[in-house]
Amino acid sequence: MSPRIPRVIKHEVLIRPDARIRIHLESKGSELVHLAITLEHEVSLHDWRAVVRYDTEGGVLHRDRLTPSGDYLTHRERVQMGLDWHQARKNIFDGLVSRAEWHIGEYRKLLRED
């Protein structure tokens, strides 16, 4: 039996002129190896910065909120999806789209404080 070859999917979706969601998914067969979904904001021309990131680093799905300097505003907030990773990915994506304005607004407040 040959070893399963990892499948990597990278996708980027522009959700408004200054906001995009980047998806990085790695799986082996039906097993999720790594998932990262990041809401990014273009603070100036071609300067995209991570605002919120969901990922499975460390083996647990969690959310990090980031500051303009790249530090953690919140770190490793556990996320309970209780679903298969296909549905979790969809729920995270949909949640980021629906809350993008709020997340970016909070991020921009921090930009003004810097």
Enumerate the predicted regions with their spans.
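Small/flexible residues
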Residues: 6-12, 18, 22-24, 55, ...
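Glutamate identity and glutamate-enriched acidic tracts
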Residues: 10-12, 26, 31, 40-42, ...
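General helical secondary-structure elements
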Residues: 18, 59-61, 85, 95
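A short, structured beta-strand/loop element
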Residues: 31-76
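Acidic, low-complexity intrinsically disordered segments
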Residues: 69-114
